């Protein structure tokens, strides 16, 4: 019987079986570990992504509340933050939050556009822009969310879309501490 040195057809079988069992054990434990979450309303989201989404939502809401508070302080107004209608963020030296806010002023809902620049490592926040866009009815704001990208006859939504397109095409924000212009 000839036998090659270092090779035997049966010597690797126990090791392969052990490796397969280990792989099955790891795969069975993965849904309960910090990997995937396979139940409830977050069924297909990776937990790390879900945490990142929640963190970004919290950062946007914090920036929105800061913008309203700064406006109230500087203008002597009494606006109340209601909700974020739309949020975008741009990473510059820090984060520039481009927000469409619904606020309540004396019981009347209005839309405001706000841009807030945040550098958390310096404990820095600045409102770059905060301006009234138009009046808001609950139905109009909800319709805008539901009909994103669709034509609509609602003048509030149409004017907001026109404003957004104008901003994207023509407006650039020059931040005084930068030597460059960042398009928003």
UniProtKB/Swiss-Prot annotation:
It is found in: Secreted. This is Cysteine proteinase inhibitor 3. Residues 1-35 form the signal peptide. The lineage of its organism: Eukaryota, Viridiplantae, Streptophyta, Embryophyta, Tracheophyta. Residues 48-134 form the Cystatin domain. It comes from Oryza sativa subsp. japonica. PANTHER family: CYSTATIN FAMILY MEMBER (PTHR11413), CYSTEINE PROTEINASE INHIBITOR 3 (PTHR11413:SF124). GO terms for molecular function: cysteine-type endopeptidase inhibitor activity. SMART domains: CY. GO terms for cellular component: extracellular region. It holds the Pfam family SQAPI. Keywords: Plant defense, Protease inhibitor, Secreted, Signal, Thiol protease inhibitor. InterPro entries: Cystatin, Cystatin_dom, Cystatin_sf. Residues 138-165 are annotated as: Disordered. A motif (Secondary area of contact) lies at residues 90-94. Specific inhibitor of cysteine proteinases. Probably involved in the regulation of endogenous processes and in defense against pests and pathogens. Belongs to the cystatin family. Phytocystatin subfamily. The record marks 39 as: Reactive site. It comes from the Eukaryota. GO terms for biological process: defense response.
């Amino acid at each position: 019987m000839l036998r090659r040195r270092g090779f035997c057809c049966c010597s690797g079988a126990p090791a392969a079986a052990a490796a397969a069992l280990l792989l099955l054990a790891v795969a069975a434990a993965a849904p309960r570990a910090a990997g995937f979450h396979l139940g409830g309303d977050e069924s297909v989201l990776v937990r790390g992504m879900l945490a990142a989404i929640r963190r970004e939502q919290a950062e946007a809401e914090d920036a929105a509340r800061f913008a309203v508070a700064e406006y109230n302080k500087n203008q002597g107004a009494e606006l109340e933050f209601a909700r974020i209608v739309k949020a975008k963020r741009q990473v510059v030296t820090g984060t520039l939050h481009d927000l469409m806010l619904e606020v309540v002023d004396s019981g009347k809902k209005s839309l405001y556009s706000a841009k807030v620049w945040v550098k958390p490592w310096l404990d820095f926040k600045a409102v770059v822009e905060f301006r009234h866009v138009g009046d808001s009815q609950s139905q109009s704001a909800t319709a805008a969310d539901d009909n994103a990208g669709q034509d609509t006859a609602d003048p509030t939504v149409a004017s907001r879309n026109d404003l957004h397109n104008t901003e994207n095409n023509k407006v650039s924000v020059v931040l005084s501490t930068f030597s460059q212009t960042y398009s928003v």
